[in-house]
Amino acid sequence: MKLEKILNNIDYKLIKGSLDTEVSGLYYDSRKVTNGSAFICLSGTQVDGHDYIKSAIEKGATTIIIEKDVEVPEDVTVVKLPNTRKNLSLLAINYFDNPASKLTMIGITGTKGKTTTSWMIKNILEEDGHKTGVIGTMGVFIGNTHYDTVNTTPESFDIQKYLKEMVDDKVEYAIMEVSSQALKVGRVEGLSFDYGVFTNLTKDHIGEGEHENMEDYIYSKSLLFQKCKHGILNIDDIHYEDMIKNSTCDIHTFGKNKEANLLIDNIKLLRKEHFIGLELNTKGIIEDTFLVNTPGEFSAYNASSAILTTYLIGCKVENIKKALSKVAVKGRVEIVPVSSKYSVIIDYAHNGLSMQSILETMRAYNPKRIVSLFGCGGNRSKERRYDMGEISGRLADFTIVTEDNSRYEDINDIMNDIEIGLKKTSGKYIKIPSRKDAIKYAIDNAKEGDIILLLGKGHETYREINGVREHLDEREIIKDILNNK
């Protein structure tokens, strides 16, 4: 592809070389550069791509795209942009021939519920006969292909690459979790969404390398509703008005507020063998009853956002109902079939807020006991450890403290920090360093009516120790324990 085509509709300055230069590929990682490609220099908080120009040229880059004035060898084409990171998305859109324009784009933002909502929408669309692709916290899913990702919303170039693959694979609907950070730094610059979904907003992601304050966090979230045609929003959320203040889309709402287009009329919690979920009655645009295969009042909100979105798309209500009755999201309040006498749930809850939410949610189902099993990540905030220890000690009947991704810290030091929080309560607990042994202890000591919560790992199937990821899948551990009982 000619460089000129890649720069279409972008403000640039040709420093030297030719716009007729053929570009065989676009790269922002100098280690991946191939012969005849263009290297885009991104200025990050820790790494500056301008420092790797020499390495990129040695690997065969014939075009360098910069935002700073730097020395570049004579025989290389150089283009200067005002902001390479924001323009990376536009460059990639041009390079991949704007794949989003060939898809129906659904973007989901919110502090909690993005992953569950995206999978609910995916399941409904597939039940209605459509092919989907998903980009989010659990990775990228295109048909039967799965790619792991580092961020909830990948780098802008990678987003376009995945969208192009979806187009090639005849996908109709692309469902994307859109983080506030992605909106802030421009990873979705130039992307238009057909549907934008807002789940909720609570204080999170405030600090170094994220958002400087709550105002910045709120504003960043609201940007999605300047990028979509239809906005589907939680009208009950305290920040609903902030989300729509500068919106340019049609607004559709869900919630308990009588003004909601889809009114949450009644929620009935249900627990039976291998099922912990709810019955949701709606009024307004849809008057019906939905059985939802995920527990808690927050699941009613996630389900309502999915119902309203897919209804606006044109899915049949009977298919929406069918999909929600069997939806299962890996690592998100995931019920593992074990026994008719007690329940085991795997969930990604890995901070105080999410832990409190799931513990309070499960208490509403009146279990005999709630057993909370968790650890905390190494080389991370100690405050989180104290917080989670105290919350588990206060809200669970019994706590099992174990390992998580200890990284470069001693597991026992992390458990001791969690114990500090636990000791602020009267909660009973035990410390078991091996997660496998901890799960076995929980199952061996389960009582009728118990709900055992395995928290923190969720969809992850590894543990990280001293920089090495080792395979660890809680589902496999549970299966082995039950097979050997």
Q: Which residues are covered by each model-predicted region?
A:
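Short internal beta-strands
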Residues: 62-68, 232-236, 373-374, 398-404
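Short glycine-rich anion-binding loops that position phosphate/pyrophosphate groups of nucleotides
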Residues: 44-46, 70, 180-181, 202-204, ...
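ATP-dependent carboxylate-amine ligase
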Residues: 1-12, 35-38, 248, 285, ...
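Phosphate-binding loop of NTP-binding sites
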Residues: 7-10, 86-231, 235, 239-250, ...
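A short, gly/pro- and small-residue-rich
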Residues: 49-62, 78-87, 194-200, 215-219, ...
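N-terminal leader/targeting and accessory segments in enzymes
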Residues: 1-90, 94, 226, 238, ...
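Acidic, Mg2+-coordinating active-site environments of NTP-dependent enzymes
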Residues: 7, 71-75, 169, 194-344, ...
